Amino acid sequence: MDEKSNDRIRVMEIVSRSQYNDEVIDQVDMSDLDLSFSDLSFSDLSEVMARRIMAKRVVLRASSLMRAAFHDCDFELADFRSCNLEEINMADCRFGEADFSKANMKYAKINISSCFETRFDEADFSHGELVGTILNHATFRHANLSGIDAEQADCTGTDFSGANLTNSKFEKAHLENVNLSAVDARNANFTEADFTGAILLNGDFTEADFTGAKLDNVVWTGANVEGAKFDENVKEQVLKII
């Protein structure tokens, strides 16, 4: 049996014991188990609870982590592609350059975390939470973010092109230089958000709320703002450049 297989067995023993005893996995240094390069694809990690674990570059592709909970963990460069992360709760974690493409993230929470250059392309993150999370230069291309709560999130340079943002909440979010091309953002709440330099090309912002938002140097070409709310006299200026 090779070393990677041994690492997988040892990790799954820890996980199974945690699941069976309903215990929190606390401060496990996964680097000692060489988990940084382990492949845990297709594993069942549902309802696991863990804090302060190191899991850089771990491969969890197509695994189930439904209703799992992670606090103060490091998942930089981790592979979560096509995972079932429904109702997962993650806080104060690091996901730099991790990949959540095509993951099921309905009702998932990634709050007060760091997701620098993280990929969420085509993920279903509907009704989830990204409150206070850093998402600089992350990508959500064609993702479903309907009903997401991203209040005070830092999305500077983030790519949401083609995403579903209907009924989403981005109050006081940093959206500088964000790409919102061709998004469906009907009824979205952008109150007091900073859109400086953002691209809203061909987006649907029907009934969206931009009250108090900073809108300097925004590209509005082709955008639909029918019924959208703006500060006094702002909508007239926007309509002139669409």
Spell out what each predicted region is.
Residues 2-242:
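Tandem repeat scaffolds
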